[in-house]
Amino acid sequence: MMLFRAVRHSDLNGVQSLSQRAGIGLTSFPNNLDQLRSRIARSVDTFDGKLARAQQGFLFVLEDTSANRVAGVSAIEVAVGLEEPFYNFRVQKTIRSSRELGIYKSIEALTLEQDQTGNSELCTLFLDPEYQKGRNGTFLSKARFLFIAAFRDIFSKTIFAEMRGVADEQGNSPFWNSLGQHFFGIPFSQADYLTGIGSKTFIAELMPLHPIYISLLSAEAQKVIGQVHEKTVPARAILEKEGLIYQGHIDIFDGGALLQAEIDRIRAVKESRLVSVSKAESVTRDDGVPCIVANQQFSEFRALLLNVVCDSNELFLTAAEMGALQVSDGDQVRLVSLFPKEN
């Protein structure tokens, strides 16, 4: 059984094992034991109500209960940029013209911005390559939306996801090589790692403050602006189908797309609903469709991916499923179809 749940301190070894396989470019998931321990502690403290809004962040794991193994992670930051600046580039068009020469040029430029300050963030999505099959990745990503829907008041009006940009296995980023390298003088992998472990002051100290004309970058760098790493293409598609869109904001290091949406307009949030559960000795799932089913408990939030009839007002679960969700007869659960309805 694949169970989506809040992270625990005891998950540290499993989470670290995953981080070793994540590779370069997943900034918020560094292979650093102390940082991962702190990240887990921050999530636990957030669930326990010990942190101010600016520090709050939820980390979840996807557990293979049959193997007692952490198969994936995903996270939500409540409000970014309230204590430390959160930077991104915005792609903007500027007009240059000469009446004397009869020349009119529309030129794109990159402007350093802090537009996402105060917004919530979807981040740290990584699934063990051994589990990258079936619907595990989609479940791991979208289960967060049911948590957001259940505890909507915690989060901001807008949410975004900064997608991993284009880089090769050695950590070479065309965008970084053409832009960031000139200002920082360090490899992309080092800048990415420093940001991941919380060393961010160098960004404000060294990043260019004036607009940068995109036409001055290399052809390779221009091609990857607003694009994502080949391994991130499925994750981008998942979010876009839920209503998040690219609006010209990109990652300052690798040029990866930043997707965003108003939370209340996200399909899985607005279509999710509450139903009552009943225990059944056995359940036939043949007439169902893949749905995410989650309990309504804050600190013990749990979700399963089950084939069920989504439009029914009653949901029958086996004893094992009820145990995994920690619900009893008559309790309410929140559910939503895994995929949008086809028009």
UniProtKB/Swiss-Prot annotation:
Similarity comment text for this entry: Belongs to the arginine N-succinyltransferase family.
HAMAP family registered for this protein in UniProt: AstA
InterPro entries in the cross-refs: Acyl_CoA_acyltransferase, Arg_succinylTrfase_AstA/AruG, Arginine_N-succinylTrfase
Protein name per its UniProtKB record: Arginine N-succinyltransferase
Active site (catalytic residues): 229
Sites where the protein binds succinyl-CoA: 125
Reactions this protein catalyses: succinyl-CoA + L-arginine = N(2)-succinyl-L-arginine + CoA + H(+)
GO molecular function: arginine N-succinyltransferase activity
Pfam family, one: AstA
This protein's pathway: Amino-acid degradation; L-arginine degradation via AST pathway; L-glutamate and succinate from L-arginine: step 1/5
Keywords, in A-Z order: Acyltransferase, Arginine metabolism, Transferase
PANTHER family registered for this protein in UniProt: ARGININE N-SUCCINYLTRANSFERASE (PTHR30420:SF1), N-SUCCINYLARGININE DIHYDROLASE (PTHR30420)
